[in-house]
């Protein structure tokens, strides 16, 4: 691992995004969105967790981590965040835990990881300065 100021910035930015996302998902709500398969709510869940996983992958890349390590920890952290946020929503007024939301989160994470596999050179740090 090669820790650089740029790597620190990426992790700081991604960590801040994760905290913002958790805070936003735990705000009390007056009404619950409808549970449709392709509703705007599900698309927002997918996009939010796609961005979280993507941020983690770039953070690990800037730290000089290998692709297998990048993939593994991006998946573990993203899935942990998604599951934790859904469980906590059960205790927030106007919110509820939803397996549909968690599946949408997982799809977003999966799409980011698919991008890592389809475009590996994009996610690997070049050896030139």
Regions picked out by a protein language model, each given a short descriptive name:
Residues 1-102, 106-129:
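Bulky hydrophobic segments
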């Amino acid at each position: 691992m090669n820790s650089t100021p740029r790597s620190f910035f990426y992790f700081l930015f991604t960590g801040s995004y994760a905290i913002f996302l958790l805070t936003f998902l735990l705000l009390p709500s007056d009404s619950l969105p409808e549970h449709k398969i392709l509703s705007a709510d599900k698309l927002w869940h997918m996009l939010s967790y796609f961005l979280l996983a993507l941020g983690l992958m770039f953070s690990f890349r800037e730290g000089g981590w290998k692709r297998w390590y990048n993939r593994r920890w991006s998946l573990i952290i993203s899935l942990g965040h998604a599951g934790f946020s859904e469980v906590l929503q059960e205790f927030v007024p106007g919110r509820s835990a939803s397996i549909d939301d968690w599946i949408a989160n997982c799809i977003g994470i999966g799409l980011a990881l698919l991008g890592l596999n389809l475009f590996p050179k994009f996610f690997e740090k070049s050896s030139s300065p």
